[in-house]
């Protein structure tokens, strides 16, 4: 079974992604911040990472940079930002 790491701090989005992916036959793990994401990443292999940009502790860019130093696992960056700053 392919495993996907969901890194998202919003509980509703976590649940939506987890439910959709598990219903499609994927195994999932959920991290609510950048530190938890790195801990899970080091603890078990994943086939894909869905990574929110805006996270507590370490943002998505920082997490991506640290993972890229060790792995070429595919990463899809997500954001709920909808306006211009």
For the regions a protein language model found, what residue spans apply to each?
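N-terminal/domain-start alpha-helical segments
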Residues: 1-85
């Amino acid at each position: 079974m392919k495993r996907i790491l969901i890194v998202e701090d919003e509980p509703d989005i976590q649940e939506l992604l987890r439910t959709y992916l598990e219903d499609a036959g994927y195994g999932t793990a959920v991290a609510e911040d950048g530190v938890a994401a790195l801990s899970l990443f080091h603890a078990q292999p994943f086939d894909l990472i869905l990574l929110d940009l805006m996270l507590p502790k370490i943002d998505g860019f920082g997490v991506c940079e640290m993972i890229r130093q060790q792995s070429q696992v595919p990463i899809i960056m997500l954001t709920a930002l909808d306006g211009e700053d």
